[in-house]
């Protein structure tokens, strides 16, 4: 008999486990005294097909912590009891150890505990020592995904493949998504967040043929709901503040929470940061959307599905899934056709990497110099600035950097745009549903991301006279209305009611300092309004209809990484309009705009009525 007596105190057990003469057998001896219990601790079942966080009961920590003591390196200083307990709880939470119970806890042999540590070290890319050494403990403290790494006992067996599958997939190929709430802490604007999340979904769409469509959750229940939350947020994975668990997502299924993806709002979410102060949102989003599609964690060194945060992964426009993740995804949803002429049902928001060699430009359509300005259209599309000129366009990332100094081809990017369309005169992203509208002549085309939807439609739908075309179009977030400018006049369109507003056109001179017949107008990610004409731009602060005193300024140095002019350019300013009484006009416009404003801002309207007027 290895353990005399019928009851053993924790102190006595520590003494017995530590003694070298205690027993030559294993700890699985049936002679180990058992304490009477009503039954093992039961975790309430969940109908959601997602991994569960298995928390180690308090009574199981001392025993398993003591069992791990012999696994510590002999020459290293043993960590204290709190660190060992943390390690055991960590291994249990992330699936490497089963939950302890008072009846079967003694079945945990040292060999099985060593195996669990080795699997953890394999996932982390550490030497598989089977010991809770300092590097292992340090890795356990790294920021990571909330979900377990091992899905059942089979996950402990070394596989030829590194990826793991949850066993659940979406039964449809078009998935809808929506953002329930944005981060309250991050300096990233909602528009940039939406763009990064769209790109993260597009990464998976490229390799699977799946289609992701953003919808308004007020009108349609999305498959994937994205939520920035803190601490407990009504699921089984409460967040732990900055630096611990970063995010989690639920596997596909029929439950309302299936596919939902949550980010810890106490993290400092960044994008394109060159320092270590923050967590790259795009990298984490790609990882979590892998879970939302049915992938588990992977131990492959380069996999985006490794459980630990690995830092930024690069430009969303060029990022592609590593091979291990592609293999796992295609096990679930099949392979994308390898025929280069075959088109998947949905293209990503960004094109795949361009071929290394491109045909020379035709003399009829030479590549223009971006620093010359005179753009045909400028638009903010999901946080990126598109600048159109002839059959070309440039793109600026949300960080303000050029995607490439070389422009992209118009028809190569916008699939389905008629070949006879050589110039885009105006463009904007419709805020109601994210559709992208391109204008040329008296017509416009509607795109779902890059794919054309339907035939050309006439501009008369926006309230313009038949045969009229536009100089500029933009949606103003101050009141949610869409503005269409032609020459010295502008029209206004109500997107919600889907009709032109009465009382238009009006004089563009109401926008004090704006140039007549601008090349285009767009809204920045910070909410400022920018008029573009020729080689210069005019800035209007958020919510203002008066140009800033430093306007106009050259476009090139500010937007396109062009050298600053040697001297201040001589710009012919638009004719200044004399100040005139606008009390009635202001009153009418404010009454209309107030329907779109937050109730918290309504008491401030009398204070600013002298500055905000009808336009």
Swiss-Prot record:
The precursor is cleaved by a furin endopeptidase. One of its GO terms (cellular component) is extracellular matrix. The keyword Transit peptide does not apply. Disulfide bonds join 371-562. The keyword Thylakoid does not apply. GO terms for biological process: hard palate development; proteolysis. The active site is at residue 288. Residues 1-162, 594-615 form a propeptide. It comes from the Eukaryota. Its cofactor is Zn(2+); Ca(2+). May activate progelatinase A. Belongs to the peptidase M10A family. This is Matrix metalloproteinase-25.
